[in-house]
Amino acid sequence: DNIKPMKEFESPEKLYDELIASVRKYHPSTDISLIEKAYHVARDAHEGQARKSGEPYIIHPLCVAIILAELELDKETIVAGLLHDVVEDTVMTDEQIAQEFGDEVALLVDGVTKLGQLSYDADKVEVQAENLRKMFLAMAKDIRVILIKLADRLHLSLIHISEPTRRR
């Protein structure tokens, strides 16, 4: 019920404001400085990158973080949602994430990155079994890794569904 349809090219600033409003709604006293720092790091790291639709890449991590915030997850999970593609798609390292945001966030980002290396060849039973094995290992370490990955996939699915509408 909380998941909203894709909006046509929302500005990153408007999405960031929506993220903070969502966090403050369920945790009014939360210190948002770590979330703010993660947004700025992700925005700067993805500077100049765009999705196939032409919108700035930072829109995707922001939408993932909003989904996580609407699920009322903790600040570290939301921060990891903002940073989930930074190590994979930019020059930032796991060590830098740990140094800037702490080991907990770094472990979440690393877990999502490793899950991102899953193969999606639906025809191969062995590949599916390996994917499940990786997911169960990630869940055993921290279920939040799976929640971030699911939010990531959900947003990518929403983009995919809404693209034919945008092309018209």
Predicted feature descriptions by range:
Residues 1-162, 166-168:
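Active-site helical microenvironments for divalent-metal-assisted chemistry
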